[in-house]
Amino acid sequence: MGQFISFMQEIPIFLQEALNIALVAVSLICIVKGLVNLYRCGLFQLMVFLVLAGRSCSEETFKIGMHTQFQEVSLSLSALLTNQSHELPMLCLANKTHLYLKSGRSSFKINIDSVTVLTRSADVFVHSPKLGSCFESDEEWVVAWWIEAIGHRWDQDPGLLCRNKTKTEGKLIQINISRADGNVHYGWRLKNGLDHIYRGREEPCFEGEQCLIKIQPEDWPTDCKADHTNTFRFLSRSQKSIAVGRTLKAFFSWSLTDPLGNVPPGGYCLEKWMLVASELKCFGNTAIAKCNQNHDSEFCDMLRLFDYNKNAIKTLNEETKTRVNVLSHTINALISDNLLMKNKIRELMSVPYCNYTRFWYVNHTLSGQHSLPRCWMIRNNSYLNSSEFRNEWILESDFLISEMLSKEYSERQGRTPITLVDICFWSTVFFTSTLFLHLIGFPTHEHIRGEGCPLPHRLNSMGGCRCGKYLPLKKPTIWHRRH
């Protein structure tokens, strides 16, 4: 009884929705049936062939289905590598020989040659990351971080020479990487480190000759552009520990904030000031949840890198510089080593790989829902044509529609009263019963045996027309169900 009363109270709510759905369903069935019939006649196929034969299709918008389109989003890292203090380092390779390093407002030039500038008798000898006598405080940690990234170990490797920062000649640090005598293993290790973070550089030193690295402050050249892939390599090279499994730790929980630190509603928005070059695109909390569940997407790595940079700037501005060492210890929780290694192997094998810049996704134009962006692969320094991975974005659209239908089905199940389900069940039983009666069949009219049906005239027992139009034929009649 209580269930029936609850059902009666909910009638105004679900009847309004059910009635509208019923009316729309009837209309759609009629329209779809008519279109299907028209489609089966072949007229549409002929018109489409005559219009499109010999013409090229536009690539501006790819329509996968009726309401799904293939779209893309481009990420700009100009805000990530901005001119602020204590930011992520940015590396540049100019003309394959000039190496540069920049972090915050400090920039450095790295020269590699055989000319000795500093001597142990006249300059400072350092064997620890404390370079306060060589550089200012905002430059010291950057240089020490870079030296560790190329493979130098302070507690095991030879010391370095640097010029006292009070001298008028300028700040300078000198590292001996000559691959000769007892220094050969150390030299090879640092050379490999340079090759790792500066891909494509030319080696100016030869085996057995003197080779020195000189680091000195210098203005950032205008022809150097931000290359976040070098930053990725730098971070992965300078990590202190490697975890076998990659899971997002509590320290790197998502911080959905704007540039001022305010929490915006509706999810993580990649705004013009931060990522998207041409427009605003918001990726809701659903995409964030997918990234937290599955750590196997280049797009998720990019978002984690942005979030890490914001947290690092806030932490370093409020606390001491020693916090950088703690952050670098846990940097491996940000970037998936498996993805980096996989993309590098693809690059070496000349197969498509990801450079973490351009991503594509499938967008549903009616509901605004979209799939999790996936990396747009590169081959031979150019992005793949969208037709080359057509199966991937068609499959992604199928997954998106399946996810939407599953979510809609769950919501409708929650809004459907149990009594309505009972009514639907008994109405189905009633329909099955009437269908059984329809299959048995009942006679609908009477006509002369062996001859055509005289409808709309009715016959009498003599085989004549009751209205008198036809004379009695004295022929047997029979009841028939079909005209």
From Swiss-Prot:
A GO cellular component annotation in the UniProt record: host cell endoplasmic reticulum membrane
Indicate where a lipid (N-myristoyl glycine) is covalently linked.
G2
Domain free text: The cytoplasmic domain of GP2 plays a role in ER location. It also contains a zinc-binding domain that allows SSP retention in the GPC complex by accepting a cysteine from SSP as the fourth ligand.
Q: What is the protein's name according to its record?
A: Pre-glycoprotein polyprotein GP complex
GO term, biological process aspect, one: virion attachment to host cell
Topology feature Extracellular, residues: 2-17, 54-58, 59-422
List, in alphabetical order, the Gene Ontology terms for molecular function in this entry. Answer: metal ion binding
User: In this chain's numbering, which residues are marked as the site (Important for GP-C-mediated membrane fusion)?
Assistant: K33
In its UniProt entry, the species of origin is given as: Tacaribe virus (strain V5) (TCRV)
